[in-house]
Regions:
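A short acidic, Gly/Pro-enriched loop at the edge of an enzyme's catalytic core
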Residues: 124-132
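Conserved SAM-binding strand-loop segment of SAM-dependent methyltransferases
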Residues: 109-120
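Conserved SAM-binding motif I beta-strand of class I
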Residues: 89-94
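Conserved SAM-binding loop of SAM-dependent methyltransferases across substrates and taxa
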Residues: 76-87
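N-terminal auxiliary segments of SAM/dcSAM-dependent transferases
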Residues: 1-28
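Conserved class I S-adenosyl-L-methionine
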Residues: 66-75
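Conserved SAM/SAH-binding beta-strand->alpha-helix loop
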Residues: 96-98
């Protein structure tokens, strides 16, 4: 079973899609997809967060079962499940607890998943990762990073988290 780690959670969610996230959580807990709903009930956030098409962003990449992946900005888990199917272990970081709860509900059966809730800048990891995946959050990350040159600081931090020769991917 996946692990939901709240050690770095400050009880403050910094962003949200609003009340639709409660609907998304309920859908995830019930194992439902937006495809199960009548068309008039489907909204953009449902499709955005739950469409299997989003996995295509990295499904082609030849991850191996020996690989460890750090997923930064995991959101509601749009690509988390795919990463878990391909890699040996996935550590997903999400700033919003509600989104992490949705990700957990979607992927709770994954034995190789740890979801960490909180600001990446506050976290420490006992190991480095073979791959660091930044999926559509780089443009927001600067809002949660202090410093004069936050983009450079963020890129440097990602590099420190990956093994020597590790790969960093920023996909939108």
């Amino acid at each position: 079973m996946a692990e939901l780690n709240l050690d770095y959670y400050t009880a403050k969610d910094h962003y949200s899609d609003g009340d639709i996230e409660e609907t998304l959580l309920k859908m995830a807990q019930e194992g439902k997809s937006f495809e199960d709903l009548p068309e008039e009930e489907v909204s953009f956030p449902m499709v955005y967060h739950f469409s299997g098409l989003r996995e295509n962003i990295l499904s082609w990449y030849p991850l191996k079962k020996a690989d460890s992946v750090l997923e930064i900005g995991a959101g509601c888990g749009a690509i988390t499940g795919m990463l878990c199917r391909k890699a040996g272990h996935v550590t997903s970081v999400e700033l919003s607890k509600r989104r992490a709860d949705i990700n957990y509900a979607r992927n709770r059966d994954k034995e190789n998943l740890t979801i960490m809730v909180g600001n990446l800048n506050d976290m420490t990891f006992p190991e480095k990762f073979d791959y660091v995946v930044v999926n559509g959050v780089l443009e927001y990350a600067m809002s949660f990073t202090e410093g004069k040159n936050s983009l450079r600081d963020i890129s440097s931090a990602y590099g420190r988290l990956s093994e020597a020769g590790g790969k960093t991917s920023d996909r939108h």
